[in-house]
Design a protein with these regions (language model features):
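Conserved alpha/beta enzyme-core scaffold
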Residues: 2-242
C-alpha cells in the first residue's frame, strides 16, 4: 500500500485521512462531529427487468453474477449468518475468477476461517481488499500487510450506517438464504441451513444495485414470512448446500 498521511485523532491515535481512496474523518470526540449530506437511495426497479411469471431463477452463481453485470473494481457484499459453515462467499469469488474479473472489494458483514481460499483470490488479483470483520487466516493475512488495500472493520450497526449513508456503495449483494422462492422472498427459519434471522443482509438487499439470493431450499411462492423481500431481489439461484 502507498504511504499514508496520518493525523492525531481525539483519542490520541495516529490515523489516516484517506482509506482506500476515500476521505476518512478522524474521531473528533463525543458529539463533536455533525455529519452532512443525505442518505443513499436505492435504484428504481422496474418489471421490465423481470419475467412476467415472476420467476427470477438462473442456473448458477456464475450466471447470476454475469447477469448482474459484474465487472472490475465493483463492491460485492455477503453476510455471515452461516458463520464458519458458509459455502456461498467462496463460490462467488471462484465464479468471479472464472469470469476474469479483477480488483473487487469484498464487503462481508464478517468472514471466518472457512473463507481462507479467498486469500488465493487476493493473490491472483480477483479481490483487491476486504472491508469487514476478518477472523482466522484472512485476519492474519491482512494484519501482516499482504492485502493491497486497507482492511476496514465496522460494527454491525456501523456497517448498516455506512451503507445507508453512502460511505460504501454495494454494486452486487449476494445473500445466502436457507429458504427462498423463485421471486426472491427469503428467510432463514427453515431448510437444511436454517440460521434464524437474516438481518445482517437487510441493508444489502435494500441499497445494492443488484441483489442475488442463493439458496439450497427453493420452495414454491410465496416464501413466508419473508425477511428479504423479493421486490428487492434481481436473481435467484441454487447450490447443493449453502
Amino acid at each position: 500500500m502507498p504511504e499514508q498521511k496520518l493525523v492525531n485523532n481525539a483519542a490520541g491515535r495516529m490515523v489516516p485521512t484517506e482509506i482506500n481512496g476515500k476521505e476518512a474523518i478522524p474521531y473528533k470526540g463525543v458529539a463533536k462531529h455533525r455529519p452532512e449530506g443525505r442518505k443513499a437511495a436505492p435504484r428504481l426497479s422496474t418489471v421490465i427487468d423481470y419475467p412476467d411469471s415472476g420467476d427470477k431463477t438462473v442456473p448458477d452463481i456464475k450466471a447470476a453474477l454475469k447477469a448482474a453485470g459484474l465487472r472490475d473494481g465493483m463492491t460485492v457484499s455477503t453476510h455471515h449468518h452461516l458463520r464458519n459453515g458458509d459455502f456461498v462467499a467462496n463460490a462467488v469469488f471462484d465464479a468471479a475468477a472464472e469470469l476474469g474479473v479483477k480488483d473487487l472489494m469484498w464487503f462481508p458483514s464478517a468472514s471466518f476461517p472457512i473463507h481462507a481460499p479467498i486469500i488465493g483470490h487476493m493473490k491472483n488479483g480477483v479481490v483487491h481488499h476486504i472491508e469487514g470483520s476478518m477472523n482466522g487466516p484472512l485476519g492474519r493475512y491482512c494484519s501482516e500487510g499482504h492485502m493491497r488495500g486497507m482492511g476496514v472493520l465496522r460494527s454491525h450497526g456501523g456497517r448498516y450506517r455506512a451503507v445507508q449513508d453512502a460511505d460504501v456503495h454495494i454494486d452486487i449483494a449476494v445473500i445466502a438464504a436457507p429458504t427462498a422462492d423463485p421471486f426472491g422472498n427469503a428467510h432463514g427459519l427453515t431448510g437444511p441451513a436454517a440460521c434464524g434471522l437474516l438481518g445482517f443482509a437487510l441493508a444489502d438487499s435494500e441499497y445494492a444495485d443488484r441483489v442475488i439470493v442463493v439458496t439450497d431450499n427453493l420452495i414454491d411462492f410465496p416464501c413466508v414470512p419473508w425477511q428479504i423481500q423479493g421486490n428487492n431481489v434481481d436473481y435467484v439461484t441454487t447450490m447443493d448446500a449453502i
